[in-house]
């Protein structure tokens, strides 16, 4: 039985969640991490979880008599200025006799431990399930057939049939039942004119609200793949990934606003409706190969036709007008307001203000070195922090409905 012998392992999920199949392995491992993904508190200092049913995650490999264990609190932090900042706790499930509290019997009282058992479970028995080695095995998606945790907690929904190379976005189980917010209706955009941009921005908002997690390492990998396979990660500018915007040649799409906001700009997702898929680009393009001193250059010429009776035709035209050769420009509704006359009027001898008194300069305290900050974190906490790069709650903006279908993008 693998308990606390392993070192360097943690409850934190692997940097990239990979699912190898619908069932967790029957054989234990040498790691000390939970087989299952975590449930996460929505707020700091949330009370310990309560469950509608037994609280034991579904596992078809176990008999009913073996369905018992405990949920263990994992404190989480992210680095701040000179100190670490706490974030809401995560709770991980372990079978009785495994994990960090392997020496406890079922029901033993200990802070940060919540015992759970299915009806008919033999709580006096100890599990041979072991724990997970994150380097060898994937996390198993949480499923509760008889009810999950209370409303103070959430967990990321992961499809059971997703393979290791599959793509999906993790969706917050709590977010799926929330009604859309109406706050975005107060914005400047209204009517059908900007339906396309509104729908595109809503898709981005939904993806963020559903909790897609991208680590710092994954974002860097996305931005530095082979050029033709790159995608813009959250928080990156367009020119950081695809180079400066130009006019009249390759790289001529995007105005200054789009360059700064990257994928947060709703126009990006809107225009992706018109971008060909990989297969369409390969088999529907005029392909021109050309040998150059630095290698083989492949040119793909593809034409997407937007019918004039398309309900979003005018919006596509508007975006193209703004973004094709748009470097150095911004949308009219995004231009900064001109300063008032009083502030823009040149100063004269009669109107010049009296010189201000010089404030005493404060002595600059030497900043704490990075190694001093790092000393405040344990090795387990550092590994946890690696997962928190994009773990903050996204800003929820409801841009309204539009004419686009749900699955067009």
From Swiss-Prot:
<dbReference type="GO" id="GO:0044172">
    <property type="term" value="C:host cell endoplasmic reticulum-Golgi intermediate compartment"/>
</dbReference>
<protein>
    <recommendedName>
        <fullName>Nucleoprotein</fullName>
    </recommendedName>
</protein>
<keyword id="KW-0687">Ribonucleoprotein</keyword>
<dbReference type="GO" id="GO:0042802">
    <property type="term" value="F:identical protein binding"/>
</dbReference>
<feature type="compositionally biased region" description="Basic and acidic residues">
    <location>
        <begin position="247"/>
        <end position="259"/>
    </location>
</feature>
<feature type="compositionally biased region" description="Low complexity">
    <location>
        <begin position="162"/>
        <end position="179"/>
    </location>
</feature>
<feature type="compositionally biased region" description="Basic residues">
    <location>
        <begin position="358"/>
        <end position="367"/>
    </location>
</feature>
<feature type="modified residue" description="Phosphothreonine; by host">
    <location>
        <position position="378"/>
    </location>
</feature>
<keyword id="KW-0597">Phosphoprotein</keyword>
<keyword id="KW-0013">ADP-ribosylation</keyword>
<feature type="modified residue" description="Phosphoserine; by host">
    <location>
        <position position="190"/>
    </location>
</feature>
<dbReference type="Pfam" id="PF00937">
    <property type="entry name" value="CoV_nucleocap"/>
</dbReference>
<keyword id="KW-0805">Transcription regulation</keyword>
<keyword id="KW-1015">Disulfide bond</keyword>
<feature type="modified residue" description="Phosphoserine; by host">
    <location>
        <position position="379"/>
    </location>
</feature>
<keyword id="KW-0694">RNA-binding</keyword>
<feature type="region of interest" description="Disordered">
    <location>
        <begin position="326"/>
        <end position="409"/>
    </location>
</feature>
<dbReference type="InterPro" id="IPR037179">
    <property type="entry name" value="Nucleocapsid_C"/>
</dbReference>
<feature type="disulfide bond">
    <location>
        <begin position="320"/>
        <end position="323"/>
    </location>
</feature>
<feature type="region of interest" description="Disordered">
    <location>
        <begin position="238"/>
        <end position="259"/>
    </location>
</feature>
<feature type="domain" description="CoV N CTD">
    <location>
        <begin position="215"/>
        <end position="331"/>
    </location>
</feature>
<dbReference type="GO" id="GO:0044177">
    <property type="term" value="C:host cell Golgi apparatus"/>
</dbReference>
<dbReference type="InterPro" id="IPR037195">
    <property type="entry name" value="Nucleocapsid_N"/>
</dbReference>
<dbReference type="GO" id="GO:0019013">
    <property type="term" value="C:viral nucleocapsid"/>
</dbReference>
<keyword id="KW-0946">Virion</keyword>
<feature type="compositionally biased region" description="Low complexity">
    <location>
        <begin position="341"/>
        <end position="356"/>
    </location>
</feature>
<dbReference type="GO" id="GO:1990904">
    <property type="term" value="C:ribonucleoprotein complex"/>
</dbReference>
<feature type="domain" description="CoV N NTD">
    <location>
        <begin position="31"/>
        <end position="156"/>
    </location>
</feature>
<feature type="compositionally biased region" description="Basic and acidic residues">
    <location>
        <begin position="180"/>
        <end position="192"/>
    </location>
</feature>
<comment type="similarity">
    <text>Belongs to the gammacoronavirus nucleocapsid protein family.</text>
</comment>
<dbReference type="InterPro" id="IPR044345">
    <property type="entry name" value="N_prot_N_CoV"/>
</dbReference>
<dbReference type="InterPro" id="IPR042547">
    <property type="entry name" value="NCAP_gCoV"/>
</dbReference>
<keyword id="KW-0804">Transcription</keyword>
<feature type="region of interest" description="Disordered">
    <location>
        <begin position="1"/>
        <end position="32"/>
    </location>
</feature>
<dbReference type="InterPro" id="IPR044344">
    <property type="entry name" value="N_prot_C_CoV"/>
</dbReference>
<feature type="compositionally biased region" description="Basic residues">
    <location>
        <begin position="70"/>
        <end position="84"/>
    </location>
</feature>
<dbReference type="GO" id="GO:0003723">
    <property type="term" value="F:RNA binding"/>
</dbReference>
<feature type="region of interest" description="RNA-binding">
    <location>
        <begin position="29"/>
        <end position="160"/>
    </location>
</feature>
<keyword id="KW-0543">Viral nucleoprotein</keyword>
<feature type="region of interest" description="Disordered">
    <location>
        <begin position="46"/>
        <end position="84"/>
    </location>
</feature>
<feature type="region of interest" description="Dimerization">
    <location>
        <begin position="226"/>
        <end position="333"/>
    </location>
</feature>
<feature type="compositionally biased region" description="Basic and acidic residues">
    <location>
        <begin position="368"/>
        <end position="384"/>
    </location>
</feature>
């Amino acid at each position: 039985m693998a308990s606390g012998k392993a070192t360097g392992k943690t409850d934190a999920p692997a940097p990239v969640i990979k699912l190898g199949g619908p069932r967790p392995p029957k054989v234990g491992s040498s790691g000390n991490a939970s087989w299952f993904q975590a449930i996460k508190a929505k707020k700091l200092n949330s009370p310990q979880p309560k469950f509608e049913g037994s609280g034991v995650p579904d596992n078809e490999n176990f008999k009913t008599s073996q369905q018992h264990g405990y949920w263990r609190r994992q404190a989480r932090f992210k680095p701040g200025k000179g100190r670490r900042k706490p974030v809401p706790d995560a709770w991980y499930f372990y079978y009785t006799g495994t994990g960090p509290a392997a020496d406890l019997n079922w029901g033993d009282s200990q802070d940060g431990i919540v015992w759970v058992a299915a009806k008919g479970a033999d709580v006096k028995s100890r599990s041979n399930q072991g724990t997970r080695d994150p380097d060898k095995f994937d996390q198993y998606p949480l499923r509760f057939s008889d009810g999950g945790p209370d409303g103070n907690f959430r967990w990321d929904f992961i499809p059971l049939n997703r393979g290791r190379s599959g793509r999906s976005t993790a969706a917050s189980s709590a977010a799926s039942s929330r009604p859309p917010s109406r706050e975005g209706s107060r914005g400047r955009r209204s009517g059908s004119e900007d339906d396309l941009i509104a729908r595109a921005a809503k898709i981005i908002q939904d993806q963020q609200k559903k909790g897609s997690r991208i680590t710092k390492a994954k974002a860097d990998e996305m931005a530095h793949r082979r050029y033709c396979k790159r995608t813009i990660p959250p928080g990156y500018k367009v020119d950081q990934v695809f180079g400066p915007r130009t006019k009249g040649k390759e790289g001529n799409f995007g105005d200054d606003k789009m360059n700064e906001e990257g994928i947060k700009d709703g126009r990006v997702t809107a225009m992706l409706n018109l971008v060909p898929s990989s297969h369409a680009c390969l088999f529907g393009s005029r392909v021109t190969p050309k040998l150059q001193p630095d290698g083989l250059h492949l040119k793909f010429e593809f034409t997407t036709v937007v019918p004039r009776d398309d309900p979003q035709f005018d919006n596509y035209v508007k975006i193209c007008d703004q973004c094709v050769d748009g470097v150095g420009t911004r949308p009219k509704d995004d231009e900064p307001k001109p300063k008032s006359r009083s502030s823009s009027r040149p100063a004269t001898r009669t109107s010049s203000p009296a010189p201000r008194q010089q404030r005493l300069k404060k002595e600059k305290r030497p900043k704490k070195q990075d190694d001093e900050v790092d000393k405040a974190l344990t090795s387990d906490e550092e590994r946890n922090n690696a997962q928190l790069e994009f773990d903050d709650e996204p800003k929820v903006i409801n841009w309204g409905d539009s004419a686009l279908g749900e699955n067009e993008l």
